[in-house]
Amino acid sequence: EQVFTVTGGGAMFLNQSLGGHEKLRCTFMHHEQACAMAAEGYARIAGKPAVVMLTTGPGSVNALNGVYGAFTDSIPMIVISGQIKRETCISFNDVPGMRQLGDQEGPTIAMASPVCKYARLVRSESDLEKMLPEAYTEAISGRPGPVWLDIPLDIQQSTQVINIAPALLAEPKFDTDKLSKSCREIISKLSASNRPLILGGTGVRLSG
C-alpha cells in the first residue's frame, strides 16, 4: 500500500509503474536513507511492511543504513532497486578484474545480503514469478526483516506477461521439546525468586 522512494534513471520504469498505480501511495523523499527509515517507522505503526524503491548504485548504497536498522530490530521491509541493463552489468558479463562496467553500477546484492533476510538479483522476467512471493513471505514470516530485489533496467521495461501467485505466510517452526524445557526452567526460576524482573524484548511482540 505504501511506497517510499527517490526517483532515478536506474529505476525509471519502476518509478512509473509503482508511482502510477491507483492502489499504491507513493511518498517521494529527498534521500534514500530517509526512505528506509520511513518504511521502518511505517511498519512499526501500521503493522505491515512498506516498499522502499531505489535507483541503482549510489541510490541503493544510501539506503543501507536504514535497512540495517530494520534488520537488527526485526522490522519487515520490502526493498526494490533498479539495476543497470543486463548488457552492461558485471553480474551478466565475464569481465575479470573490473569493479564497474555500466554507468553507476554497484554490487547491490553483495552489499545488501548481510543485512537482509532475502536478497536476490532478478536475472529474467520469469524470476519475478518466484522471487516476489518468496521475498514478501520471508519479510513477514518468523522473525521479520528486510528483503531486497534488484531489477535490471531492461527487465523493468519488459512487456512479457508473468503470473505471480499470492504470497503465503510461512508456518512457524517450533521445537516443542526445547520449548517445554525452557518453560520448565522459567517456572523453576520464578518460583525460587523473591522479586522477579522480566525484561520483554521484541520477541514478545512478534509472538502476538
Kindly label every feature range from the protein language model.
Residues 1-208:
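N-terminal alpha/beta PP-like core and its mobile active-site loop of ThDP/TPP-dependent enzymes
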